[in-house]
Amino acid sequence: MTYLFRFLTVLLAASVFFTLKAEAQVADYDKVNGVLSFENGVGSVTASKHSVLDVSTDHNKLGEHSLVWSWNKKGAYLSFNEAVPYLPENPDPKETSVSSFVFWVYSPKTLEGSLKFVFLKDGKECCHFTYGLGFQGWRGAWVAFDRDMQGIPEIGMDEIRIYAPEDVKKGCLYFDGIIPASFQDVRYHTPDWQAPFINEQTKIHWLVLNNSWKLKLDIPLKDKLSASDLQDMDTVKARFVELITEKAKPYTLKKARQIYDSYDISFNPDGTIKGKPIYFIRYGETFLNLNISDAKATFQKNGQLLRTLNDHLLRIAVSAMRAEDPQKKAEFTRIYLDLTRHLLDQGFEAGSGQGTLHHLGYSMRNFYTAPVIMQEALRDAGLDKKVQQAMEWFSGVGEIKVAPKEPGMDIDAFNTSLMGRMASVIMLEDTPYKYAYMQALSRWIDNGMKHTEGLRPCFKRDGSVVHHKKSYPAYATGGFTGAVDAVWMLSKTGFAISKQSHQNLKDALMAMKFYCYDGYFPLAMSGRHPDGKGTLIPEHYERLAKAGSPDGSLAVDASLLENAPQKGTRTFGFNCSMSHRFGHRLVTIAGHSRYLWAAETYQNANHYGRYLTHGSMQTNGLFRQDGWDWCHIPGTTAAVLLMEKMKSNVLNVDQYSGYEEMLLSDEWFAGGVTHKGVSGSFGMKLHEHDKYNGSLRARKSFFAFENRVVCLGSDIESSLEGAPVHTTLFQNYVEDVPEITFSPYINDRRDIIRNCHSEVYFIQGAQACHTKGIQQSLHEETDKPTEGEFEKAYIEHGDIVRDGRYEYMIFMPADNNDVMFAHDENALEEYSKALPYAVLRHDTSVHGVKDHESGTRAFAVFEEGSVDSMIVSSTPAMLMYSIEADEMTLSASNPDLALYEGPSDEKFDADGKRIERSIYGREWVDNPCGVTYITLTLEGLWDIVEGNGCDVTTSQNNRQTTLVFKSREARTEEIKLRRTSL
């Protein structure tokens, strides 16, 4: 392959330095991209006296060759006469990456001392750093010029020198994949044993491995282990092995040999191993700013990914464990051990940072599992301690050696770190130290399940599991796997977690069962994956049940296994949503606020879902994406745009975030209240972010009683010319529905409309617009055209809207009689003449209704003032009450999460528009929810007869009763009062 051909390939493809040869490992590299991979000789590199340079195939990390340097006298050095394209700032102000030096170095044997890397301009040193040796195999680093090096880097540096350790007379090292200067994400440089000064102030949990390693265990050691102690440790290990092997499929020996051969494993004359270079997938990001965008894909295509090898290792370990033939067992074991040696040699050893290790968890899952199965074989091969230390390093388990300072932990830690940490401790020899380490592990898991404050991860008192600063079921399920498995593994041993933490986990699982549609997440709770595919995992409930009840009184917790329909109404303050159940029906109502984002969008996910929580109301779980109109999410009030214009413009807005969009409102009023556990109300002040249509505002409310929901809207305004504002009633995929033979309109007024699921909408003061047919849309991840047959209905408000409003009620069939009623047009007409509710208020300050069947009155009090004849005055709140004889049940909620006080913290540009900012960079993001108050005055004299644990004070004056509720976390406060006098 000629240089010209390679140059043209780079020029035309604008990407790849990888060869097309089937046997290639990572590829030849064209210097035009800025990486030195030594495929065509030593190039511009020179060596001092008493040292020798060459290229070698003995060891390689990028391409098939590396630079090998041998010296036999102190003071030796290498000189790279290369332009160093350092810049003090990224030319793209949207980028948060910094100029960094990137390299890989291989040491065939352990050398003492440190290398010194010096960067020069016109022969004068500008900056330098030292890099410790003391290892065998590959090591890599990202070193930021301005943050991590000593001295002052300069534009125009033109030479790099690498000095041998001062006191080492002779040695040999290999170098590869050197990038003199490139922009790397400022957040993710990883410190390690060789270069602990790199990004040393980082707090990111993936990157603090060096700090965790240094910690000392704070639990006193027993003098001697009892038989019970040893049995407990054996029980945990046996359960661990059961977990990791129950679904693992063994390989045939033929397949295992093919896998082994694919890694090109061989041994050099000096005994060192060589084979196909292995990369953690995120290392591919190293090349992004070199116009090489597909490095990750190439690693995958060439079979070079860490995750792939780790997955193979688990299945090979299972194959060895289950093999009955001694010869086959021996060969599976040999294959496993050689691949493990290769992985260690590739830099996956204790103390190695590899440049970056951010979000390492998924790739390393089975790095930890297979060794537990193969512990005896590793011990026989003399690899057990080295492997255990690598497990301990990469899992960051050292963090657990000291008691946690605050409750909770990231749900990702349950998902991606917990099993690795447990395996790392299980791999230790059975000593008092291991027992104490197991106690520390149990303490850490227990602490992780404790309730946390504000938006800190992850378990909340309302049953939510918070990730990315909002309730996030899709991440919760992954975390539940680790959490449930851990509780089961430790159950009924001396390491069992506490009753309260066990209960918190159970509550979160039961909450998920409550808010899911037959196991499927509501659209508004699908995070950045609104594809209708996210589900709870039944195995979580089954395994946690086997762990027994939280209080230990039951060997099996059967309540987790019940399949009876869920009942009642619940609000989820940390999701800004309400779930209402009646019969088999579930309604999900969702909003957003100045604390909780409207939608999460990434460059490759949820491009069109910005309206997901614009006051949405989902009545069934039958979502289909093909042809879905993203402008018409049921319940929402939003501007209708061409689908191409709906696509989010995803930016990297600050150093606290990546390329993502998570827009906030500037309004705090968004949330719900429940009444007697069976009905509920939800209200919000909608104000879309200025990034798109900041002129859109509305006040929206929903009042749910049995199989009916009353929906009110007022103060709707928008000035986006040419983009009509619609309040969507429904949108349903109809290709799977039997042919509809009836008209959706019940009358000529078009104020009663029925959909394909026999849901009936009664509209007041407006007509419903209904369409049915093939819809074209765009896929939320790929932008590819999609189509499908849908029906939808909406109320149109116009494009330039002022003081818009709506009122409608939805009737949802909950049994066969309801379905028959929904298809009786005469009955529907009669029903519409005396609907089972009355609107009490529908203005800027208050939305309120009375449900005739239950007698319950419900209000969204947006502004302080009078409410009705009973509630003389109230501060902003969601309120519901019902009276039977002289007793009132009063429910109240202040939807303000109160993470900060005062006006919105938004910042504005020169035109007065809100600037897009990451939620992670807000000063209040880790604050606890503050105390909030609801003050209301009732007509008449009332005494509290049931306080239900509420913090409420009363005072009476002028034949009126004033109540002051003290609350937090947007929870419902419900009390019962008795009238003593009118």
Model feature map: region roles:
Residues 1-25:
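Bacterial Sec-dependent N-terminal signal peptides
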Residues 25-50, 192:
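Extracellular carbohydrate-recognition regions
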Residues 100-103, 116-118, 140-183:
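Extracellular beta-strand ligand-recognition surfaces/modules
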Residues 28, 164-209:
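Extracellular polysaccharide-targeting segments
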Residues 479, 486-945, 955, 967-973:
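Extended polysaccharide-engagement surfaces of secreted carbohydrate-active enzymes
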Residues 55-79:
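Short carbohydrate-recognition loop motifs
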Residues 71-150:
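Extracellular ligand-binding interfaces
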Residues 230-530:
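Aromatic-lined, polymer-binding surfaces characteristic
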